[in-house]
């Protein structure tokens, strides 16, 4: 992903976002499985004006470049220091949505709710590499994980009960030219980070996302089944007092939306256009060839990740996504999507004094919390879940957090195959290479994790 320009990433005020809500349609699921399916496959090229090399937009380049940071948009609220922990207890409702490049997107099938009783999401415990590949979620070269911190026999299980670790990783597609599957690295990295979080025996506040990223990377390097590859990563650790620490390496990123305004966004790290910071495993043979013929591989490390601390409040929505999202929609698009869905589902309410968090937030994030709002093929709403029914049902996956994740992923999917809509990648390509005519979206793998904060004290008073 490339760093979008300031003008294309600027977020408008909350008022302009609310005005756009009337033009947006509430998220709904079509019975047609082709709902976000691209009608045609697309291969676009970006040409360097000073070379004859043609570069596919989905293939990150790995030249020997001087490290240079780039910026993405701006804060709608001023940059602030890490706030004092909230005295109330915060719990987190987490869901993910993903779609592989060139594959159909199913809003319900491609949504995954995190259940802390299960411990982890997006992780395969199968030791057979072939079985692991077969059981991966439909995310292509992208990967995600969500895990509780610590197990149930830990000495700190009471203090760590609501602590959550989460993240996304985007495999570097350029490794396919060396006959390496980039998905092995990204999925392996997320799997090892989830295992590290699950087996954490100390207080959750002692686990930092950069430390988690380092542990996952060390395991990937030691894994003989992952012979080569690379990945970007965006990782977070959320504590029960609302403190969230985020570590971002590369062009995956985060956006925090608070009551119809962008409260925080991450800054992408790139060496140049379409060349993000990336963790890498480089075989000795390839290193030797590079030393003989000249040149060098890009090698960044977990210590290079940028770290940000935020304080989540009741009703906040945190989006963690790969560049398949940020290459096709900008912060303004994400803000309008989240605001419209939160208000139309009743999670936020618009009042004379501003946007407020609804009393129904906890119920909407429970299993099947939004099932009544989704139509069936006959047009009638799905029946509400019977509380006495212990068997899990597909409609239980329809929660507020899964709807938000699927909405962002679905919008990015549609924008990626739209020839007439210039996304952030297209605008940046036009700025870097004005002689080339790159238009439309960028077809890529897409992965989104959504985290909603619930203040247990406020939610209990409203029941």
Regions found by a protein language model. Give the residues of each.
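PP2C/PPM-type serine/threonine phosphatase catalytic domain
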Residues: 2-463
């Amino acid at each position: 992903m490339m760093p979008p320009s300031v003008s294309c990433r600027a977020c408008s005020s909350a008022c302009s976002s609310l005005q756009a809500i009337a033009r947006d349609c509430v998220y709904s699921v079509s019975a047609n499985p082709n709902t976000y399916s691209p009608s045609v496959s697309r291969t676009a090229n970006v040409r360097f004006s000073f070379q004859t090399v043609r570069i596919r937009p989905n293939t990150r380049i790995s030249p020997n470049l001087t490290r240079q940071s780039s910026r993405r948009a701006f804060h709608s609220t001023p940059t602030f220091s890490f706030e004092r922990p909230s005295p109330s207890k915060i719990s987190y409702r987490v869901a993910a949505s993903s779609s592989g490049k060139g594959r159909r997107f199913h809003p319900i099938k491609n949504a995954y709710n995190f259940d802390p009783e299960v411990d982890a999401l997006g992780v395969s415990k199968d030791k057979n590499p072939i079985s692991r590949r077969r059981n991966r979620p439909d995310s292509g070269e992208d990967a995600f994980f969500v895990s509780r911190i610590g197990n149930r026999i830990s000495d700190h299980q009471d203090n760590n009960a609501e602590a959550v670790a989460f993240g996304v990783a985007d495999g570097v597609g350029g490794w396919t030219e060396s006959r390496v599957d980039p998905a092995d690295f990204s999925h392996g990295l997320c799997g090892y980070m989830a295992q590290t979080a699950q087996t954490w025996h100390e207080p959750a506040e002692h686990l930092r996302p950069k430390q988690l990223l380092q542990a996952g990377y060390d395991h990937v390097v030691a894994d003989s089944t992952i012979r080569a590859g690379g990945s970007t990563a965006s990782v977070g650790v959320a504590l029960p007092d609302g403190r969230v620490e985020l570590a971002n390496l590369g062009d995956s990123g985060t956006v925090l939306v608070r009551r119809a305004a962008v409260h925080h966004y991450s800054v992408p790290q790139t060496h140049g256009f379409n060349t993000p910071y990336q963790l890498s495993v480089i075989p000795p043979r390839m290193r030797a060839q590079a030393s003989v013929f000249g040149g060098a591989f890009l090698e960044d490390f977990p210590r290079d990740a940028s770290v940000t601390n935020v304080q989540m409040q009741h009703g906040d929505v945190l989006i963690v996504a790969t560049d398949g999202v940020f290459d096709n929609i900008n912060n303004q698009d994400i803000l309008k999507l989240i605001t419209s869905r939160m208000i139309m589902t009743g999670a936020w309410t618009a009042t004379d004094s501003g946007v407020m968090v609804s009393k129904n937030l906890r119920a909407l994030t429970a299993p099947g919390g939004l099932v009544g709002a989704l139509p069936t093929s006959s047009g009638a709403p799905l029946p509400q879940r019977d509380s006495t029914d212990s068997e899990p049902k597909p409609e239980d996956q329809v929660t507020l957090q899964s709807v938000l994740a699927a909405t962002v992923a679905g919008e990015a999917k549609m924008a990626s195959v739209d020839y007439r809509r210039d996304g952030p990648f297209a605008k940046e390509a036009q700025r870097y290479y004005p002689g080339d005519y790159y238009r439309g979206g960028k077809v890529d793998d897409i992965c989104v994790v959504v985290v909603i904060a619930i203040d247990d004290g406020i939610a209990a008073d409203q029941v």
